[in-house]
Amino acid sequence: MNGSSRTTRGAVFGSAGLLVGVALLSGCGSGDEGGSKDSDKAGSSDSAQAQSPAEAVQATNEKTTQAETAKIAMTVTTSGGQAQGKKVTGDGVMDLQDGTSKLTLDQGPNTIEQRVVDQVLYQKLPKKAAEQLPDGKTWMKVDLGELQTRGGGNKGLNDPAGSLAYTKSLSEKNVEKLGTEKVGGTKTTHYRVRLDLAKMAKGDAAQQKKLREQLGDEVPMELWIDDKGMTRRQEIELQVQPSGAEGGKKQKVKTVVELSDFGTEVDVQPPPSGKTADMTDQAAKGAKQSS
C-alpha cells in the first residue's frame, strides 16, 4: 500500500506541474462572455500594435478564448535536488474555454495519456506504474475542483477551469515589451510579465500567504502574442516545494506552452469508470505534506 501511494502520488504531482502551463491558457471564458469569433477576425494588426504592453497582455485573454479550441504543445523542465534535468514533453488538443483537453506526455521511455474533462484529471499510467493501482485499474483520476476545495490547488495556477483573467488587472509596471519573434512561423510580440500574487489571491489573505510560501514573492511569466492579439507561446517558471521534501530545497519548474491550429476539433471523453481508480484523497494528502 505504501508503495502504491508513493507511485501514484508522484504521478499526480508530475501532472500538476504540467497543468500549471495548461491552466493559465484554459477556462478563460469563466470571467467575461463578451466578444465573438467575427469580432476577433475584424481586429487588425494595426490596432494590436497601437496598444500599450499592458493593454496587449490584458486583451489576450479574451482574444485567445474566442478561438474556442487549439492544438497545444508543451515542455516542462525541472531542476534542483533529485529532479535535476527531468523533462516532460506533451502535445494534444484543448478547449480554451472550459479546459477540456487530451494530451500525450512523454518522459524518457515512459508515456502517459492524460485527459481533463469537467475539471477531473485522468491519466493512463505506464504499465509498471499502473501495476500499483488497486484492482488492476489502468487509469487514475483526480478531481481538481475537490483538490482545490481541500487546499491542494492554487487558484489561477493549476485549475483547468481557471483563466488568464488576472491579466486584466496588470498595470504598466508589470509588463515589459521585449521585441518581435516568430513562433511556429507566426510573427509575435514578446512580453515579460510579473504576476501579482496579492491580486491573484483576490483579497484572500490566507490564500496570498499560501501562494507566497509555495511560489515566492514574484512569479515571472513571458508571453508571445500575435498580431490578432492571440497567445502563441507562454513560458512560466515556478519555485515549488516537492512532495515529501519538507524543509528541503525547492525545485524550479519551467513550463513552455505553444498554441496553434486555432479552431481544431476537440472531442474528449472520460475513460471507462471500471478502469479508473480515484486518487483524489492521496493527491490532497500529498499536497498538504508539501505545503
How would you name each of these model-derived features?
Residues 8-20:
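Sec-dependent N-terminal signal peptides
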Residues 24-27:
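C-terminal motif of bacterial Sec signal peptides marking the signal peptidase cleavage site
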